């Protein structure tokens, strides 16, 4: 009976892996100071539990932020965040990667606060060679202020995938063969910040920050970085092709992951530059490859 139970359990695990796709590797809990340091308004960052948890605080005087100590070419970058609760209109919590030059590459998560009872909006964007204008917006299918959720980026030579709790919400494929630049030779640092953006963040700036609700707090956990660390001037990753994120199963989404992406597209997407015919009468070439049109 014991051997039969073990066999059934193993079979279930194999079938579950096939059914739900291959998720990125889970991050390891390490303290904030291992990989990050504050960059401004140091007194607005609070450290808890030996640095395993960090709170960013925004008031009417300033927000705050932090960045990674290292720069990275490819990897899996995640953060567990609990967003500002209650009336968060006008606030933006950002988690992103960016290189440090004028023709920079950038991969963005921006969480746009809202009035109490209204959904948070998650805006993503990708900059290549200094050019962005690739905004996509979704409503999250949960309240991100109630608990910690994982937000992550898988970046390799083949694709950039945005995940929310291991659900792919966006893909940006390497489309250099059709003339679209792709981030591949500019190391990026990891950044996060909480700041006031009530000139645009909520309903295009119509909803202003209610400072009577301050201070606003965004909470963070999970400061492990799983990336190819490189100097800011490096042009390639020395371990290219050898890390888990380079392997075949991470070079494209599988059928089930595309199904989940389609679910997000159908039920939660509220803006997609790929389908905006006012801004782009002819869809950008990457959109068809990314299955966004």
Curated annotation (Swiss-Prot):
Places the protein is found: Secreted, Cell wall; Secreted, Extracellular space, Apoplast
Main location: secreted
Signal peptide annotation: 1-21
Residues annotated to bind xyloglucan: 110, 123-125, 133-135, 199-200, 204, 279
Disulfide links within the chain: 228-237, 274-287
Example of a GO MF term: xyloglucan:xyloglucosyl transferase activity
GO cellular component annotations of the record: apoplast
Important for catalytic activity, annotated site positions: 108
GO biological process, one term: cell wall biogenesis
UniProt-annotated catalytic positions: 106, 110
Tissues where this protein is expressed: Root specific.
Maturation and modification: Contains at least one intrachain disulfide bond essential for its enzymatic activity.
EC number from the UniProt entry: 2.4.1.207
Sugar-modified residues: 114
InterPro entries found in the cross-reference section: Beta-glucanase/XTH, ConA-like_dom_sf, GH16, GH16_AS, XET_C, XTH
PROSITE patterns xrefs: GH16_1, GH16_2
Induction text: By brassinolide. Strongly down-regulated by abscisic acid.
Keywords for the protein's UniProt record, in alphabetical order: Apoplast, Cell wall, Cell wall biogenesis/degradation, Disulfide bond, Glycoprotein, Glycosidase, Hydrolase, Secreted, Signal, Transferase
Reaction(s) the record says it catalyses: breaks a beta-(1->4) bond in the backbone of a xyloglucan and transfers the xyloglucanyl segment on to O-4 of the non-reducing terminal glucose residue of an acceptor, which can be a xyloglucan or an oligosaccharide of xyloglucan
Segments forming domain GH16: 23-220
Family of this protein: Belongs to the glycosyl hydrolase 16 family. XTH group 1 subfamily.
Cited function: Catalyzes xyloglucan endohydrolysis (XEH) and/or endotransglycosylation (XET). Cleaves and religates xyloglucan polymers, an essential constituent of the primary cell wall, and thereby participates in cell wall construction of growing tissues.
Protein name in the entry: Probable xyloglucan endotransglucosylase/hydrolase protein 5
Lineage: Eukaryota, Viridiplantae, Streptophyta, Embryophyta, Tracheophyta
Gene: XTH5
């Amino acid at each position: 009976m014991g051997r039969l139970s073990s066999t059934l359990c193993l079979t279930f695990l194999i079938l579950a892996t096939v059914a739900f796709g291959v998720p990125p590797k889970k991050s390891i809990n390490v303290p904030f100071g291992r990989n990050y340091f504050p960059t401004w308004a140091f007194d607005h960052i609070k450290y808890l539990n030996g640095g395993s948890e960090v709170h960013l605080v925004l008031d009417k005087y300033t927000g705050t932020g932090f960045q990674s100590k290292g720069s990275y070419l490819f990897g899996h970058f995640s953060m567990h965040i609990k967003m500002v609760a209650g009336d968060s209109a006008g606030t933006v919590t950002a988690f992103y990667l960016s290189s440090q030059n004028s023709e920079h590459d950038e991969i963005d998560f921006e969480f746009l606060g809202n009035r109490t009872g209204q959904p948070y909006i998650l805006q993503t964007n990708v900059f290549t060679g200094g050019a962005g204008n690739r905004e996509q917006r979704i409503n999250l299918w949960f309240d991100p202020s109630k608990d910690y959720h994982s937000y992550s980026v898988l970046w390799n030579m083949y694709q950039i995938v945005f995940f929310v709790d291991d659900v792919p919400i966006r893909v940006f494929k390497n489309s250099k063969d059709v003339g679209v630049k792709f981030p591949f030779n500019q190391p990026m640092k990891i950044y996060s910040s909480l700041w006031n953006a009530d000139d645009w963040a909520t309903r295009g700036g119509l909803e202003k920050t209610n400072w009577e609700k301050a201070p606003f707090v965004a909470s963070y956990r999970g400061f492990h970085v799983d990336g190819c660390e490189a100097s800011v001037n490096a042009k390639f990753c020395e371990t290219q092709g050898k890390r888990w994120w380079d392997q075949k199963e991470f070079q494209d989404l599988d059928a089930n992951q595309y199904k989940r992406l389609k679910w997000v597209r159908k039920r939660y997407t509220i803006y997609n530059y790929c389908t905006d015919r006012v801004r782009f009468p002819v869809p950008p070439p990457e959109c068809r490859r990314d299955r966004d049109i």
